């Protein structure tokens, strides 16, 4: 087939190599032969630009394996040396980023830098997305220096990319400085800072920034509203939630049937404790997706509406919507609130056997909490010991709370030891252990724990009243 590329056409010109290269099945299965027999002169003198052919292949490839083969071919044929414009590098970096391969995207960027090709205003936003996925803030700082040297730091997309990166790394001061330095900032930069604050647990600051955006005369878009409704949900501010719901339909680029926007409203009302309003939004959706159902289930579970949460899950399955790992966190949380051990174990097994979902730490945590609250402390301990990952402070805390509830001194001491090793600065384990001892009348042990806390400066000294009986 490769040889057929060299035969003469009806007008004595070489038949286009692209006719074969654009056949993806040929390209991916014959990559080694393609490299060995590639006739560079024929392809560059034909009417088809090899760089365009590669760009088409990049847009058509569907798997990471195909993308790796394309990039390997590009490197072996020195195509990027023949066409050194950043456009071709950008295409490859973008393709890796879209396929959730940020490390490979970064490697391609480094190869681009080594080859002497300077990034442009399209390169930096793409690679910054990859760095956000990697939380590679140090590399981001180096890129910031590059952007300053090339005068790209004030570009709207570069600016929002750096704000996103700093926010995800928890460097909100740097993100804010980046935002403030440009007096002519665009909506993308506003969205980046609001989204970063919202996702970083700074809901009040996100709301304040949104108010500032409105005062500056900007009309929010769908991206703004998704971020700000999430922030509002974190504050559980119903009054603000109702105002934001009205604001949604005044925003730019908001489709009234947009699932992402409607799901954010469901989540917001759920966190505000108004499941009736969440259900109203849910029921009016043209089509509910897995996030819609999950938001309802999690909302019901959060507020102790056990029957409603489990009924919603049943309806979800009947509707043919496949649950994900977040859905099962909601379902198991409902079982915890309801104290239904058998149902919790049933759904935990269903998640693994029926849907093939590998349990996360949150799922194990729910089951440990469920067993502990029911007084099944041995079973809860066994689950902690047999989990494929190490328990975090939340899981240990659930078990510690169960030990306090049921007055189990021996297990309480065992859990406290692990909590102290995990978080030696945290006085919570000592306080609960002291309470367990007190519930059993073990006052010497109570004094011993208090002395340890005092020596390690883990608790404040007891307060004293300044008043006297003569006052």
Features from the language model and the residues they span:
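Terminal (and in a subset, N-terminal) low-complexity or junction segments at the ends
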Residues: 1-186, 195-471
């Amino acid at each position: 087939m490769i040889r057929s590329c060299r035969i003469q056409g009806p007008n004595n010109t070489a038949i286009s190599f692209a006719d074969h290269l654009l056949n993806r099945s040929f390209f991916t299965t014959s990559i080694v032969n393609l490299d060995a027999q590639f006739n560079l002169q024929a392809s560059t003198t034909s009417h088809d630009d090899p760089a365009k052919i590669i760009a088409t292949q990049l847009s058509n490839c569907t798997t990471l394996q195909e993308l790796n083969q394309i990039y390997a071919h590009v490197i072996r044929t020195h195509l990027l040396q023949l066409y050194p414009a950043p456009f071709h590098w950008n295409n490859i970096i973008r393709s890796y980023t879209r396929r959730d391969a940020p490390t490979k995207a970064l490697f391609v960027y480094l190869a681009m830098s080594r080859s002497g090709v300077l990034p442009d205003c399209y390169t930096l936003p793409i690679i910054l997305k990859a760095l956000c996925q990697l939380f590679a803030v140090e590399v981001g700082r180096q890129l910031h220096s590059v952007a300053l040297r090339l005068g790209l730091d004030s570009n709207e997309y570069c600016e929002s990319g750096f704000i996103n990166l700093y926010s995800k790394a928890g460097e909100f001061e740097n993100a804010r400085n980046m935002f403030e330095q440009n007096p002519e900032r665009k909506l993308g930069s506003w969205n980046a800072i609001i989204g970063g604050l919202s996702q970083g647990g700074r809901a009040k600051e996100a709301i304040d920034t949104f108010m500032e955006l409105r005062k500056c005369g900007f009309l929010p878009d769908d991206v703004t509203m998704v971020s700000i409704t999430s922030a509002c949900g974190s504050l559980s501010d119903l009054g603000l939630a109702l105002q934001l719901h009205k604001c949604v339909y005044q925003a730019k680029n908001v489709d009234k049937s947009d699932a992402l926007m409607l799901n954010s409203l469901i989540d917001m009302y759920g966190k505000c404790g108004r499941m009736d309003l969440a259900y109203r939004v849910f029921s009016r959706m043209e089509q509910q997706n897995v996030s819609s159902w999950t938001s309802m289930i999690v909302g019901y579970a959060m507020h102790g509406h056990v029957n409603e949460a489990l009924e919603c899950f049943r309806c979800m399955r009947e509707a043919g919507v496949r649950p994900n790992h977040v859905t099962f966190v909601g379902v198991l949380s409902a079982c915890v609130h309801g104290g239904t051990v058998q149902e919790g174990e049933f759904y935990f097994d269903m998640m693994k056997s029926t849907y093939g979902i590998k349990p996360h730490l949150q799922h194990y945590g729910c089951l440990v909490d469920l067993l502990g609250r029911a007084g099944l402390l041995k079973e809860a301990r066994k689950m902690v010991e047999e989990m494929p990952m190490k328990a975090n402070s939340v899981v240990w805390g659930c078990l510690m709370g169960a030990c306090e509830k049921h007055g189990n001194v021996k297990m309480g001491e065992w859990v406290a030891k692990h909590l102290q090793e995990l978080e030696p600065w945290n006085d919570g384990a000592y306080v609960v252990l002291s309470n367990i001892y007190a519930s059993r009348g073990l006052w010497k042990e109570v004094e011993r724990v208090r002395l340890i806390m005092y020596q390690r400066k883990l608790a404040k000294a007891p307060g004293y009243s300044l008043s006297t009986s003569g006052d």
